[in-house]
Amino acid sequence: MKLELVFIPSPGDGHLRPLVEVAKLHVDRDDHLSITIIIIPQMHGFSSSNSSSYIASLSSDSEERLSYNVLSVPDKPDSDDTKPHFFDYIDNFKPQVKATVEKLTDPGPPDSPSRLAGFVVDMFCMMMIDVANEFGVPSYMFYTSNATFLGLQVHVEYLYDVKNYDVSDLKDSDTTELEVPCLTRPLPVKCFPSVLLTKEWLPVMFRQTRRFRETKGILVNTFAELEPQAMKFFSGVDSPLPTVYTVGPVMNLKINGPNSSDDKQSEILRWLDEQPRKSVVFLCFGSMGGFREGQAKEIAIALERSGHRFVWSLRRAQPKGSIGPPEEFTNLEEILPEGFLERTAEIGKIVGWAPQSAILANPAIGGFVSHCGWNSTLESLWFGVPMATWPLYAEQQVNAFEMVEELGLAVEVRNSFRGDFMAADDELMTAEEIERGIRCLMEQDSDVRSRVKEMSEKSHVALMDGGSSHVALLKFIQDVTKNIS
């Protein structure tokens, strides 16, 4: 019998792309599986041209056992105030999701029986469990971040619900550390993302976190060799969650990005081909990472002082009070130090949107200054490129702590991990700090570089036949089949 799974990603490139890739892994591994990915459109003000192009490309890529269904944008525009209302926005799509799944479950030809086997929902789409329950099928979760942050999230919820301990009371502490079972080192509270330190957000987040336990299993975009402490926690008898399957690294590694025909990007890739091995530092801060003029100048000064070749993905952050993806700077000469572009013309390239995986794959790249988004972190490890951490928002502070302090797989740019792109005030990183981080990152014989090379090899092995993630994915497919038998 053929089995049908419904995948529901959260809006946003960082959630949609990994879920698409893990769906492809599923259909590649089992000929009896078919998957429909139901795509929820971005909230008003968050969509970008790259994201729209990617979704359009998916619609044309549908095949017999992997199809895509893009839902309609609600007639009433959603509020620009996204703080507690994001989950309400997702919840509004439940009727459309139900109608879409009803069409999937219509009786087909008698000679090709298929059965709905379950929903795989994104970590921010837990309310879709209600729809799965209406169809009488199990739900599973895909966690786009790492196992360590999953462990932190459920531990903080446990403290809140069981121990009556509210970590947001520690918001202003710069010295308090918390023992968490998914790490071997105490985690400074200053590394917590703002969502866990804001009383307004905690009840909203924990309503989602509690529902993790309603699933039959959790797929995590990591591999067992990378996060042994977290996986030890989840595999123990006291684990607070259902089975956790490590199926990563799951990445979209297409060399051609959505703007691959762009002359500027093609020029940068050609330029990289002409540079010595491991001589170029790459600075890129994700789909939501941008800077204002003051910080851009400090980065420019640091790059020039360091003397290293560079590729810099530079975009303008939204004005304070606005939310949305960063925009292109219209005139770099106006915001960068006078004469910078001329003085660095032979050793550096600046671009807006960057084809990140194509750049990281180039042998000329010797280091990666990153916001520590989990997808970017996995890409840096996959390509064996050491990373300097500059977390900006969400769980990136925790990712940075894990990579630098817990695993020794990165160096830090800043001494404090506190930061958030929605904070009221910017914390300016000085040119001296940035230069120091770049010089440390680009050391050719560092222990970090050696450890990254070793972990890169392990990441590839994990996905091979018999590798830890390959075995976990097969186990998940077996369990899906067993759970509907």
Curated annotation (Swiss-Prot):
Keyword Transferase: yes
Top-rank lineage group of the source organism: Eukaryota
Enzymatic class: transferase
Descriptive protein name: UDP-glycosyltransferase 71B2
Gene this protein is translated from: UGT71B2
Protein residues bound to UDP-alpha-D-glucose: 287, 354-356, 371-379, 393-396
EC assignment: 2.4.1.-
An example molecular function term from Gene Ontology annotations: UDP-glycosyltransferase activity
Xref: Pfam families: UDPGT
UniProtKB keywords: Glycosyltransferase, Transferase
Effect of gene knockout: No visible phenotype under normal growth condition, but resistance to hypostatin treatment.
Database matches in InterPro entries: UDP-glycosyltransf_plant (IPR050481), UDP_glucos_trans (IPR002213), UDP_glycos_trans_CS (IPR035595)
Similarity field: Belongs to the UDP-glycosyltransferase family.
Function statement: Glucosyltransferase that glucosylates the cell wall inhibitor hypostatin in vivo to form a bioactive glucoside.
